[in-house]
Amino acid sequence: MYIGIDDTDSREKYCTTYVGTLIVEELLKLGYILEEPRLIRMNPMVKYKTRGNGGVCLKIVGKIGAEDTKKNNSNKNNSNNGTPKNIEYDYKQALEDFNRGNIDYEALSKESNCKSSLKSHIKSLKSLKSYRTTLNPEITEESYKLSKSEYLEVKTIVSSIVEKYTDFDCSTTNPGIVLINSRLTRQKKAILKNYYNSVLTEIVSLDEAEAIIKKVGAEYIKYKKGLGIIGSLGAISSYFSENQTYTYELLAYRENDKWGTERYVIDSSVVEMDKMTYPYTFNNVDNNKNIIAPNTKCPVLYGIRGVSKEILFNAKEIVESENIDKYMIYRTNQGTDHHLRIMNIADARENTGAILSGYISEEFTEITGGHVLIELTDSTGSINCIAYEPTKKFRHIIRELAIGDLITVYGTIREEPYQLNIEKINVVKLNNLYEKVKKCECGGTLKSKGVSSGYKCNKCGKRLKYDEIPKIQIVRNLREGFYEVPPSARRHLSMPLSLINYLPNNLR
């Protein structure tokens, strides 16, 4: 069974990942077995998104004692909720065990401290050209199909938690739940695969989402406008994408009575964590400033992103903060560039992500507000590309570009004004630039008398034609290679350059 949830939060409170965590907690208590939950980010250009345009998906793959439960459905005294009486299950430990998954924590606990286990794990990561874990294929091919009573039980749990932890007072919060409890044919999987591509690169309408839900035999629950079903189905559809590149995020949640108060996360410990775990964790600090803790009143204390669960567990132990109520590790498409597609400039369209290659065709322009604009041209057309003020020093790179430079830009395209918001660039080839030597052999200065008259020395009076003036090559301050915006200005989906060697990508 697949469960998709989206649009429960607002800029003031709550968080869809917290809702997902509470649901996992309740399902584990009832003996349900789940794969690692997913946090899926979608097209960042959607105007009606609440915060990060991300949906959550949970996948039930079994139930402890399910067969015993079916045999004893008629037994009114059966009160173990599907858990066999001979199985001791520590519900307090359930969420912790779920997050740990199949990690050998007995071995890790024998290490002298978290730093030594971290060094051991980093050593193993360094030996890999590309880090990518795989789930057990025996349980990922098909999800567990619930009985009618189990389905109603799960549906009730999901809807009640969504209803309790949604900011219904916010006009832009429109929750939606999608449930799939049927075997999916190859045709239905193909439909979901295409839908995943759509929610990443297009603006999907509510009608389109409802039509797809009907085609694949799913059920949905809409609250208010119900726009959340678009992202809920999008999160589910990630299972059927050909691109299974992923990262992880450990989300630590605050104790309820601290929601809305100032967060206590020691910045120096975050900087230390980043130094110890980089590049296997990412987007932790910007200019030595902690950026893992949000500024909203939501339940999240902080979120650490990385390439493996093990790295995140160790990173969590290094960060010093207020008490953590609970935490969850989500498998995500963050930092994967899933929202970008390689295309010609003529094929680029508004509200989508693009990878465009071409030549700089005009000098940069400074725009009010501190933004910097350049024009990129290929054989099919031209487009303006912008580095906004929050990208700070990255704008210096854009200013160093010159007419004739061959570059590739990565980013999303605005509707109005029509331009590409730069996330990173690859300077493929720098154009050779020259300047005229304005000094005469006698040491005097050559003054221009117009294109037709050439130059005249102000000291000896010697005249030179325009094309007789010697040229020297200008030494460029810019070097060929990749450049990216700082972490604080980076989109959730944008791949940091630090991950090039660890995730399959379009950058290599």
Swiss-Prot record:
Any Pfam family matching the protein:
tRNA_anti-codon
> Where is it localised?
Cytoplasm
Q: Does the keyword ATP-binding apply?
A: yes
Q: What is its EC number?
A: 6.3.4.22
A single Gene Ontology MF term assigned here is: nucleic acid binding
Q: Does the keyword Nucleotide-binding apply?
A: yes
Query: Could you name the domain of life of the organism this protein comes from?
Result: Archaea
Gene Ontology biological process terms, A to Z: tRNA wobble cytosine modification
Q: Which GO terms describe its cellular component?
A: cytoplasm
Which InterPro entries does this chain map to? NA-bd_OB_tRNA (IPR004365), TiaS-like_TCKD (IPR053870), TiaS_FLD (IPR013696), tRNA_Ile2__agm2C_synt (IPR024913), Zn_ribbon_TiaS (IPR055394)
Q: Which residues bind DNA?
A: 367-427
* Similarity remark: Belongs to the TiaS family.
- Describe the function of this protein: ATP-dependent agmatine transferase that catalyzes the formation of 2-agmatinylcytidine (agm2C) at the wobble position (C34) of tRNA(Ile2), converting the codon specificity from AUG to AUA.
**Listed name of the protein:** tRNA(Ile2) 2-agmatinylcytidine synthetase TiaS
